[in-house]
Amino acid sequence: MQQDIVNDHQEEAQGWKWEQIKEIIESGELARLKRSRQMTDKYHEHKKRTAGLDMNQYVLQKLGWSLDEPQLENAAAKAFSSSTLYAVRANDFPYNFEPGVVHLVLWSKVALPVHSPDKAVREAARARMNAFLQAQPLLRPLLSSGHVAWFVNYPELQSVARIFHAHVLLFFPRERYSAEQVKTTVDDILSHGFEPLA
């Protein structure tokens, strides 16, 4: 089940710093990335309001997708090849990060085996994801500054386990970006989506 609150009071008050976030992702200690107590409460309230509808079905309805669609052959190599295969959304219940970190979720009908025990398979899946993000014009300024990161939670940490999704984090340092610039960039991403990967 998805991890909930953070335990350390300092982390709770400040949220994870960008460099800490990248270190945690690199280390693979993804269970350390959690929601704040306030956001966790909102998440549980949401689950109560949608009682009887599991989170997988809830997300499918929001995306207008079905799990009954045919599976692609050589799926990982075709991930993100068409805009009909994925969708990017703001995380309704973001993790506890410092101000300036925008938490998006990239939903995909094609599951990338980023945690495969087979190293070659795992590396190919990660390379596909990296190539997809690097191909996005709206992300280029952030990518060039090292201000884009992503991760896929381990299955035991996922609250929506039946639909592949990656957490995409964008960092807008407050000394370089105004609130209006951040809003404009994020609104552009959410309204236009990401471009498919050839």
UniProtKB/Swiss-Prot annotation:
Organism superkingdom: Eukaryota
Keyword DNA-binding: no
Subcellular location: Cytoplasm
InterPro entries documented for this protein: DUF3605 (IPR022036)
Main location: cytoplasm
Pfam families referenced in this protein's UniProt entry, alphabetically: DUF3605
Disulfide-bonded cysteines: none
GO CC, alphabetical: cytoplasm
GO biological process, one term: N-acetylglucosamine metabolic process
Keywords linked to the UniProt accession: Cytoplasm
UniProt keyword Cytoplasm, yes or no: yes
Miscellaneous information on this protein: Present with 1470 molecules/cell in log phase SD medium.
Protein name, per record: Uncharacterized protein YPL067C
